C-alpha cells in the first residue's frame, strides 16, 4: 500500500452499492491508518462544488442525450482535477460511488449513445486513466426495481423502466468481461452479511 489507489463502486440503481460503501471505506481506512494514509470518499456526478450543481441538473432535468453525456464528462473532468488526482498524488486512496463505467452503462447501454462517442470523450477527459479496481454490484433489474420502490422520491434515472436497466446491466457486464483484471463482481442479490463477506474478500486482495 505504498501509493494511492482509485476504487469505484458501480451498479444499476437499486443494486445496493451505496448501502455498502461507507462500511467498505471504514474497513479500508482501518487498514491504511497505520501508514498515515486517508480514504477519500466521493461520488459521481458530483464530488466538487461544480459537480454537485451539475448532479442536480443531470438527475432531475430532461435533456438531449448528447448534452447529458457531455455534462457527465464535464463534471468528471472537474472531479479528476480537483479531487481524485490530488488525493492520489498525496498517496491517499479514493473510493468513488460511480465513475466512467456508469456513463458507458447508462448513457451508452441504457440510452443508446454510440460507444465511439463515449470513447472519444473518455480519451479527452481521462487520457488512459482508469480505476485500479471497480466493484460491480450485479443484480437483476426486477430485484433492483423492488428495492427502489421502497426508497425516497426517485430521480429521473431511478424512474426508468426495467428494460432500460436491463440494457444498463448488460453494458456493465460487457465492460467487466472486457477488463476482468479491473472488475470484482459482487452478487448483490445476497443478504447484507453475505455481500459483506464478498467485500471482505475484495479487501483482502488489495
Curated annotation (Swiss-Prot):
CDD domains: TMPK. One of its GO terms (cellular component) is cytosol. Keywords: ATP-binding, Kinase, Nucleotide biosynthesis, Nucleotide-binding, Transferase. It comes from the Bacteria. The keyword Phosphoprotein does not apply. GO terms for biological process: dTDP biosynthetic process; dTTP biosynthetic process; dUDP biosynthetic process. SUPFAM superfamilies: P-loop containing nucleoside triphosphate hydrolases (SSF52540). It catalyses: dTMP + ATP = dTDP + ADP. InterPro entries: P-loop_NTPase, Thymidylate_kin-like_dom, Thymidylate_kinase. Pfam families: Thymidylate_kin. ATP binds at residues 11-18. The keyword Transferase applies. Its EC number is 2.7.4.9. Belongs to the thymidylate kinase family. Phosphorylation of dTMP to form dTDP in both de novo and salvage pathways of dTTP synthesis. This is Thymidylate kinase. It comes from Burkholderia cenocepacia (strain ATCC BAA-245 / DSM 16553 / LMG 16656 / NCTC 13227 / J2315 / CF5610) (Burkholderia cepacia (strain J2315)).
Amino acid at each position: 500500500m505504498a501509493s494511492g489507489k482509485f476504487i469505484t463502486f458501480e451498479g444499476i440503481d437499486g443494486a445496493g452499492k451505496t448501502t455498502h460503501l461507507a462500511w467498505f471505506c471504514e474497513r479500508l481506512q482501518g487498514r491504511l491508518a497505520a501508514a498515515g494514509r486517508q480514504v477519500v470518499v466521493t461520488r459521481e456526478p458530483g464530488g466538487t462544488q461544480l459537480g454537485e450543481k451539475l448532479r442536480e441538473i443531470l438527475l432531475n432535468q430532461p435533456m438531449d442525450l448528447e448534452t447529458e453525456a457531455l455534462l457527465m464528462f464535464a463534471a468528471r473532468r472537474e472531479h479528476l482535477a480537483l479531487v481524485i488526482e490530488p488525493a492520489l498524488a498525496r498517496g491517499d486512496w479514493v473510493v468513488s460511488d460511480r465513475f466512467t463505467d456508469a456513463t458507458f452503462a447508462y448513457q451508452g447501454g441504457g440510452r443508446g449513445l454510440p460507444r465511439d462517442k463515449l470513447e472519444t470523450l473518455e480519451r479527452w477527459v481521462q487520457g488512459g486513466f482508469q480505476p485500479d479496481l471497480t466493484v460491480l454490484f450485479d443484480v437483476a433489474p426486477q430485484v433492483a426495481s423492488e428495492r427502489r420502490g421502497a426508497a425516497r422520491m426517485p430521480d429521473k434515472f431511478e424512474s426508468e423502466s426495467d428494460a432500460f436497466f436491463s440494457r444498463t446491466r448488460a453494458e456493465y457486464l460487457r465492460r467487466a468481461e472486457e477488463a476482468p483484471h479491473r472488475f470484482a463482481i459482487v452478487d448483490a442479490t445476497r443478504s447484507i452479511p453475505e455481500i459483506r463477506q464478498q467485500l471482505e474478500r475484495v479487501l483482502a486482495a488489495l
